[in-house]
UniProtKB/Swiss-Prot annotation:
The protein, known as: Transcript termination protein OPG145
Subunit: Interacts with OPG087. Might be part of a transcription complex composed at least of OPG087, OPG110, and OPG145.
Phenotype when changing residue 40 to S: In strain: Garcia-1966
Keyword terms of this UniProt record: ATP-binding, DNA-binding, Helicase, Hydrolase, Late protein, Nucleotide-binding, Phosphoprotein, Transcription, Transcription regulation, Transcription termination, Virion
Cellular location(s): Virion
Positions occupied by motif DESH box: 206-209
Residues the record lists as binding ATP: 113-120
Chain's role: DNA helicase which seems to act as a postreplicative transcription termination factor. Involved in ATP-dependent release of nascent RNA. Forms a stable complex with single-stranded DNA, and to a lesser extent RNA.
Keyword ATP-binding recorded: yes
Primary gene name: OPG145
Length: 493
């Protein structure tokens, strides 16, 4: 730990990383406060900040020679096989670490790698290469399985803990596995933080973008007060301000052979309303809709739009155009609606639900990986980040209010490299609720723009389903036809 006065140059360097956002750190009294220029307090400057050689410092940091926390179960023959681009990442990491050791800098590196790159297997290779006892920290238990699979493949002795940290600490008194896989809430326990700081050298923070380290979180406190000897941040969408805690970044562009297409399924809807919809419309401009909760609630009961989504999915799936489908909603009730309707059409052998409230969901996800055809309905919260079903070939985005980081993570679910190259995303920019029509159009356009400009998708027009349900979806041509019929009938009375 390094308590330093906030001199101008130090403040400017830290502030530059936050991209204009507020800068918050722990002060000498242990309070987590916003740092003001010219402050007289001393502040705890994160160890990882000095991992970048561009940051000037006279501080000297510990090296691996001061610890003896080495892996005992390592077997070089079990090292995972990597693709050439993954080997390039390993080479970059090793080269950077040699420079850091020479300059006596902290061994902290952010691996900024695209969704589908294979961050887990690449990091397991690095872990085996370092041969140091490791803690893998994930934001939620949904990500445990993919780490468990890769760690077992490398043949490392490991322990998984997702429930009580107190029981884990008791077990650690008699055994000290080479690899600990834990959920981040374990870091709220100071005794556990002290233990891993002493007995483990490498700390891997998976999905590091899910943590805002400008907030006083368990991860923030751990990195500030119990900084590990070595640290990797793993992310496809780095949060700029988090660089203060891990200031060296490796980003290798991924060249892909995938054919990625995004369709905007565009239809004209007659205005649709119910008592429930009218009630929710009144709340759109109030404080209760600050995070667009009611905007998404309106989409969940927008029957014409829901029917269009179902019709599109059913026809594409029946035709064999798509085979392994992920359907994403924002709200749980919206997820359940689609699940029940699809279940009636295709049955439980094809349709599955990714429900965060069901403890058996991780086992179900594991079982469907081997299926040739399935429809997996889930929420953005559960499946938007880290869902490990590499065979997914299509994505239906039923919600609209999604930030850029979530969009990139979500689209990454269908960008994993497999033998099959076609990937398709469907978005629905229209709504029958006229009060949110332009808002939804703008949000969906943001999804399209990011997918095309940043992720290599190609936008194509989609017109097959313009007349998918005459009772709920009205195209421009069918509407015009009805008007002409009315005129004709009135003239012939």
């Amino acid at each position: 730990m390094s308590l330093l006065k906030m001199e101008y140059n130090l403040y400017a360097e830290l502030k530059k990383i936050t991209c204009g956002q507020s800068l918050s750190l722990f002060n000498e009294d242990g309070d987590f406060v916003e740092v003001e220029p010219g402050s007289l307090f001393k502040f705890l400057i994160p160890k990882g900040f000095y991992s970048s050689p561009s940051v000037k410092t006279s501080l000297v940091f510990e090296t691996l020679t001061t610890t003896d926390n080495k892996i005992t179960s390592i077997n070089p023959t079990n090292a995972p096989k990597l693709y050439p681009l993954q080997h390039k990442v390993v080479s970059e990491v090793v080269s950077n670490m040699r420079k850091m050791i020479k300059l006596k800098r902290p061994l902290y590196i952010t691996l900024h790698l695209a969704c589908g790159f294979g961050k887990t297997i690449t990091t397991c290779y690095l872990m085996a290469t370092h041969g140091r006892k490791t803690v893998i920290c994930v934001p939620n238990k949904m990500l445990i399985h993919q780490w468990k699979t890769q760690v077992e493949a490398v043949g490392l002795e490991h322990k998984i803990s997702i429930d009580g940290v107190s029981s884990l600490l008791k077990e650690l008194k008699t055994q000290s596995p080479d690899v600990l896989i834990v959920v981040s809430r374990h870091l709220t326990n100071d005794a556990f933080c002290k233990y891993i700081n002493k007995h483990y050298d490498l700390f891997i923070l998976d999905e590091s973008h899910t943590y805002n380290l400008m907030n006083n979180t368990a991860v923030t406190r751990f990195l500030a007060y119990y900084p590990p000897m070595m640290c990797y941040f793993l992310t496809a969408t780095p949060r700029p301000s988090n660089r203060i805690y891990c200031n060296s970044i490796i980003n290798i562009a991924k060249l892909s052979d995938l054919k990625k297409t995004i369709y905007a399924v565009d239809s004209f809807f007659e205005p649709y309303s119910t008592d429930n919809i009218r009630h929710m419309i009144k709340r759109l401009d109030g404080p209760s809709n600050k995070y667009h909760i009611y905007t998404e609630k309106l989409l969940s009961v927008d029957e014409p739009r829901n029917q269009l989504i179902l019709n599109t999915l059913v026809e594409e799936f029946k035709s064999g155009t798509i085979n392994r489908v992920l359907v994403i909603t924002k709200l749980r009730e919206h997820m359940v609606l689609f699940y029940k309707r699809l279940l009636d059409l295709f049955g439980p052998e094809v349709v599955f639900i990714g429900d965060a409230q069901n403890r058996r969901t991780p086992d179900m996800v594991k079982s469907i990986k081997e299926l040739n055809r399935f429809i997996f309905v889930s929420t953005l919260f559960y499946s938007g980040t880290g869902l490990d079903i590499p065979s997914l070939d299509s994505l239906f985005i039923c919600s609209a209010v999604i930030n850029n980081m979530q969009i990139e993570q979500l689209l990454g679910r269908v960008c994993r490299e497999t033998e099959l190259l076609d990937r398709t995303v469907y978005v629905f920019p229209n709504t029958s609720v006229k009060e949110i029509k332009y808002m939804i159009g703008n949000f969906v356009q943001r999804i399209i723009s990011l997918s095309v400009d940043k992720l290599g998708f190609k936008q194509e027009s989609y017109r097959k389903h313009q007349e998918s349900d005459p009772t709920s979806v009205c195209t421009a041509s069918s509407r015009e036809e009805r008007v002409l019929n009315r005129i004709f009938n009135s003239q012939n009375r």
